[in-house]
Amino acid sequence: MPGKMVVILGASNILWIMFAASQAFKIETTPESRYLAQIGDSVSLTCSTTGCESPFFSWRTQIDSPLNGKVTNEGTTSTLTMNPVSFGNEHSYLCTATCESRKLEKGIQVEIYSFPKDPEIHLSGPLEAGKPITVKCSVADVYPFDRLEIDLLKGDHLMKSQEFLEDADRKSLETKSLEVTFTPVIEDIGKVLVCRAKLHIDEMDSVPTVRQAVKELQVYISPKNTVISVNPSTKLQEGGSVTMTCSSEGLPAPEIFWSKKLDNGNLQHLSGNATLTLIAMRMEDSGIYVCEGVNLIGKNRKEVELIVQEKPFTVEISPGPRIAAQIGDSVMLTCSVMGCESPSFSWRTQIDSPLSGKVRSEGTNSTLTLSPVSFENEHSYLCTVTCGHKKLEKGIQVELYSFPRDPEIEMSGGLVNGSSVTVSCKVPSVYPLDRLEIELLKGETILENIEFLEDTDMKSLENKSLEMTFIPTIEDTGKALVCQAKLHIDDMEFEPKQRQSTQTLYVNVAPRDTTVLVSPSSILEEGSSVNMTCLSQGFPAPKILWSRQLPNGELQPLSENATLTLISTKMEDSGVYLCEGINQAGRSRKEVELIIQVTPKDIKLTAFPSESVKEGDTVIISCTCGNVPETWIILKKKAETGDTVLKSIDGAYTIRKAQLKDAGVYECESKNKVGSQLRSLTLDVQGRENNKDYFSPELLVLYFASSLIIPAIGMIIYFARKANMKGSYSLVEAQKSKV
């Protein structure tokens, strides 16, 4: 195996030697033969060999000029770098490679040029329509310029073309240009100027040989036809205002500048607006005003002269030449000045009386305040205004009046149908009196009219009135009573000039036809109820008042309702009841007597001076019944042969010179429609001593018997009556009551 390896290696060495010997020694350059270099750029020339492991390189120019470059060798390659390229590099460079005894040489031609920038277009000025302009197209730092061609076009139109074929042996960078003069027109706006430069180096495709510049045309028109309009006029009054408007034609649109020409001829700038407004003008504002239209290529001006005339100031006084002032009010008189900035004021009366007011001046106004207005202020007031050397005066007449309130209607009393009444219409605190008229109307009918025409120089506030008497009727109800007062001062402005008061009439009718309705009756039994209703006619509807007449004649108020109701009446409720209908016009009354009937009670039967008298004495037997009206009193003397009714006066029976036969039982019966009650007594008549029969046994027995029987009968009647009142009777109860 090792033997085989030795054989193989030996064979490969022999083959390599044979291959190397077969490779020829060669030289190559990059670029191959010619190179076009831009002045200022960096250029590298490369020389390389094949067929030699360690060649030796050298560089030179064909005419043995300086290389003006840097050589770098590395292996089989050598590089010559020129940075930057200049005119010293425009040569034929030779690269020589030596390999042992063999030497090879190859050359590269370096040609230089300069065409670094696009052309530049320059105008001799702005393009103004109708005016010639020169266009210059420049190509800077060009080389070789004998190869240069410049074309100038406007739009698609070739204006000029130029080639620079002059002999140029000098090596330098030069700027070449082409100039054209033309007259622009408006139609050129938007077109373009094209400057195209060509460097004719046909063999080198990699070099930019055409450059161009483009410029859009902007054609201008210098300002012209400048016009000024003035409103309202070039002749003005001091304090007025003026507006001046300026216009100018041009392209681009001219800017407007306003200025004023000073006395020295210089211009004082005022505004950059088309409209110039001057307000509150003074005399110093007179002069020449200049408007200039200015754009990029020119200017155009127009002048106008303003004349400011002195304005006379005016004075106004308000509220007017005359004013009607109400006494007691506050009035302000104002004096105003127009056309004077700093006036001075003074006030006075036409007859130089005291002002009686307060003056306040501020700016162009002065006020005189009269507060409160009084008779001292009835004058003609003058306001004097001084402005500089001028003086003006204005007057105002202050006239007084007083008409502060509506009339007052007063009546002497209420309106009663058929009764006369006096109406008074009073106008308070009025002035002037001789201008006053008062009118009194009922509905649309004039009742009375009066004018106060008396001449009066006295200045005072007075109350004036109109009085009249009339008789109202029912038909007047609802009508309006109108008191109308007029102050006839036609040439004075004030409100109101007429005042009125209105009162609606309501005519009263006194109560009448007053009646009382009693239900069930005016005569009642004790314990019953009764309704008494009172009716009365009148306007307004009468108010009802019930009262009861007391024994002393006075009235006891009971009720204000139309109906008076008494429940469970008692005997004490008997009496005279009075119903009154009352309104503003009067009153009307009606009486009714109410009788409450009760069973007679509290009967008293007495003998005066005693129930036991002596023969010949006078005896009064009296029977009374307590507080029961319309009760019949019957006196009787009881006897076995029959009762004897005695003639009594008001329940009293008088026995004169009593005799023994007058002795006995006397009975009193009190009766009315409701019932009755009995009482009895025994009269004992004693004989005189000389009368033997006076104490007869029969008479004595009768006396004792009657003294027992009569009280017993009375008690029986009493308990029977009591039982009737309760609805039953019991002897047991009677006996208990007696005990």
Curated annotation (Swiss-Prot):
Glycosylation sites: N273, N365, N417, N463, N531, N561
Tissue and organ expression note: Expressed on inflamed vascular endothelium, as well as on macrophage-like and dendritic cell types in both normal and inflamed tissue.
Record keywords, A-Z: Cell adhesion, Cell membrane, Disulfide bond, Glycoprotein, Immunoglobulin domain, Membrane, Repeat, Secreted, Signal, Transmembrane, Transmembrane helix, Ubl conjugation
InterPro entries named in the record: ICAM_VCAM (IPR047012), ICAM_VCAM_N (IPR003987), Ig-like_dom (IPR007110), Ig-like_dom_sf (IPR036179), Ig-like_fold (IPR013783), Ig_C2-set (IPR008424), Ig_I-set (IPR013098), Ig_sub (IPR003599)
Transmembrane segments: 699-720
Residues annotated as domain Ig-like C2-type: 25-105, 109-212, 223-309, 312-399, 408-506, 511-595, 600-684
PANTHER family found in the cross-reference section: INTERCELLULAR ADHESION MOLECULE, VASCULAR CELL ADHESION PROTEIN 1
Function noted in UniProt: Cell adhesion glycoprotein predominantly expressed on the surface of endothelial cells that plays an important role in immune surveillance and inflammation. Acts as a major regulator of leukocyte adhesion to the endothelium through interaction with different types of integrins. During inflammatory responses, binds ligands on the surface of activated endothelial cells to initiate the activation of calcium channels and the plasma membrane-associated small GTPase RAC1 leading to leukocyte transendothelial migration.
Protein name: Vascular cell adhesion protein 1
Organism: Homo sapiens
